[in-house]
């Protein structure tokens, strides 16, 4: 027997409600979030903060989180669905600014391990991005996003 997933119609209420989990985010008063996918990146960012208010596993759909003033650092489960859900929870909790730190290989010899690369465009093939921006194969970031970098 083949099963099908029933999708939500426009006039129906969504089953997934990020606001159910956003109270924790609101309690900390976060304005900015750094989302990482690896333990190494999480630890580097956490250690770079001047101070932090203890490591706490919060029910946000992430492996771990640390808060420092108005900034939160989160290690997401890997994959677009998990990171998108985490981001939706953070947005529902009032977070306005995001930086996502991933890891990828390079086909350019001049890019060495540990280099920081800021992508300015990408090709979309799958994942959750089609739920958030119009359908185009190639996406580019706004120039103001990287001014001064």
Model region roles, listed by residue range:
Residues 1-148:
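Metabolite-binding pocket within alpha/beta catalytic cores that recognizes anionic/polar moieties
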